From Swiss-Prot:
One of its GO terms (molecular function) is rRNA binding. GO terms for cellular component: large ribosomal subunit. Binds directly to 23S rRNA. The L1 stalk is quite mobile in the ribosome, and is involved in E site tRNA release. The gene is rplA. The keyword Zinc does not apply. The keyword Iron does not apply. This is Large ribosomal subunit protein uL1. It comes from Synechococcus sp. (strain JA-2-3B'a(2-13)) (Cyanobacteria bacterium Yellowstone B-Prime).
Length: 236
């Protein structure tokens, strides 16, 4: 049996018309429907015309949000030797090698992002069953397997995000906070759109963009006019 909607959600849904909104209008409505008693995130859900079970239709990459994410990112780094000092100096929240691997193997997940140097990946790979389901496994495509720890930590702390299409071809991403001005949210959303277009899988056939919806964490889903977003030119 379908769960009954709260009066709050029913009222919010009534504000949303069954149309694809212009990007700015959609974001303004998303902000208006962010009425929960906590600071809600701005979410985007994008259905693409890909089938990720095929290797040439998988999408996993990164995007830099020009206005940031609005949240503190806790970065853990697995490295050894002089790279430990480099990571510490760059502002990593947790740094270690065998000691950190052991902590994670025992269930410690007190971080939002895990970066590793290539030489320690054989050891990190043993944590796959713990890290994989949480989307925390370092990967070269995601920019989280690197020797340039200082640059990677700086970028992820500043608003760089790793994202992927799930097994149904949908990208789920938080692109800021609902408290951001519409202009800031639009800049971030445009960056996401451009990243997805730029990284179109080689095996993608037919219509690439299917639907795009935005919502506050506890708000209703609002469809965005994809063509209007892709054609949008922001002032530089």
């Amino acid at each position: 049996m379908a769960r009954k909607l709260s009066k709050r959600m029913q009222a919010l849904r009534e504000k949303v018309k069954p149309i694809a909104y212009a990007p700015e209008a959609a974001l303004a409505l998303m902000k208006e429907t962010a009425t929960a008693k906590f600071e809600e995130a701005a979410e985007v859900h994008i259905r693409l015309g890909i089938d990720p079970k095929y290797a040439d239709q998988q999408l996993r990459t990164t995007v830099v949000l020009p206005r940031g994410t609005g949240q503190e990112i806790r970065v853990a780094v697995i490295a050894r030797g002089e790279k430990v000092v480099e990571a510490q100096n760059a502002g990593a929240d947790r740094v270690g090698y065998e000691d950190l691997i052991e902590e994670i193997s025992k269930g410690m997940m007190d971080f939002d992002l895990l970066i590793a140097t290539p030489d320690v990946m054989p050891q990190v790979a043993k944590l796959g069953r713990l890290l994989g389901p949480r989307g925390l496994m370092p990967s070269p495509k995601g920019g989280t397997v690197t020797m340039d720890l200082a640059q990677a930590i700086k970028e992820f702390k500043a608003g760089k995000l790793e994202y992927r299409a799930d097994r149904t071809g949908i990208v789920h991403l938080i692109f800021g906070k609902c408290k951001f001005p519409v202009e800031a949210l639009l800049e971030n959303l445009k960056a996401v759109q451009e990243s997805i277009d730029r990284n179109r899988p080689s095996g993608a056939k037919g219509k690439y963009w299917r639907t795009l919806h935005v919502s506050a964490t506890m708000g209703p889903s609002i469809e965005v006019d994809i063509n209007a977003l892709r054609e949008l030119k922001l002032a530089t």
